[in-house]
């Protein structure tokens, strides 16, 4: 199975045969045609006003400024577009805003994919309120 993005011998990033500079020069309609089906449908149905506002904010932002003061958003369902590359966005995970630096390989994914909302639970030893059978731990 071939990858949709590659780095060539020179180390230049390509997404479906287009370099990053070409992608950033394209219109939204041209980029939409390259995206996977789910993201393409999201954009073709029309971005919400919040998503449009985020897109404009990220497009106009300076990459050096966003490194220190990231753009904060709750929009986990926003597809990552080429204009987002090299910017830092703080995505809300349900508890706090966590920084995500957008790399070229992230194009075509959703913002929420890079900030998990759940953590894996590692259970410790049985506590005071545990049942009698679960308290028993043989001494070694």
Curated annotation (Swiss-Prot):
InterPro entries: Ribosomal_uS19, Ribosomal_uS19_CS, Ribosomal_uS19_euk/arc, Ribosomal_uS19_SF
GO biological process: ribosomal small subunit assembly; translation
Bias (Basic and acidic residues): 52-63
Region (Disordered): 43-71
GO cellular component terms given for this protein: cytosolic small ribosomal subunit
A Pfam family assignment: Ribosomal_S19
The keyword rRNA-binding belongs to this UniProt entry's keyword annotation: yes
Keywords attached to this entry: Ribonucleoprotein, Ribosomal protein, RNA-binding, rRNA-binding
GO molecular function list: rRNA binding; structural constituent of ribosome
Top-rank taxon: Archaea
Family: Belongs to the universal ribosomal protein uS19 family.
NCBIfam families found in the cross-reference section: PRK04038.1, uS19_arch
Xref: HAMAP family: Ribosomal_uS19 (MF_00531)
Function: Protein S19 forms a complex with S13 that binds strongly to the 16S ribosomal RNA.
Protein name: Small ribosomal subunit protein uS19
């Amino acid at each position: 199975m071939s990858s949709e993005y590659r780095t060539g011998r020179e180390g230049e990033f390509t997404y479906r045969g287009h370099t990053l500079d070409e992608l950033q020069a394209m219109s939204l309609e041209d980029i939409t045609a390259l995206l996977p089906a789910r993201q393409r449908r999201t954009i073709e149905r029309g971005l919400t006003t919040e998503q449009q506002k985020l897109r404009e904010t990220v497009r106009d932002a300076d990459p050096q400024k966003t490194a220190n003061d990231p753009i904060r958003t709750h929009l986990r369902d926003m597809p990552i577009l080429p204009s987002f590359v090299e910017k830092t966005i703080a995505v809300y995970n349900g508890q706090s805003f966590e920084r995500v630096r957008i790399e070229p390989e992230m194009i075509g994914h959703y913002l929420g994919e890079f900030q998990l909302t759940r953590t894996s639970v590692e259970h410790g030893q049985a506590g005071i309120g545990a049942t009698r059978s679960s308290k028993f731990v043989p001494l070694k």
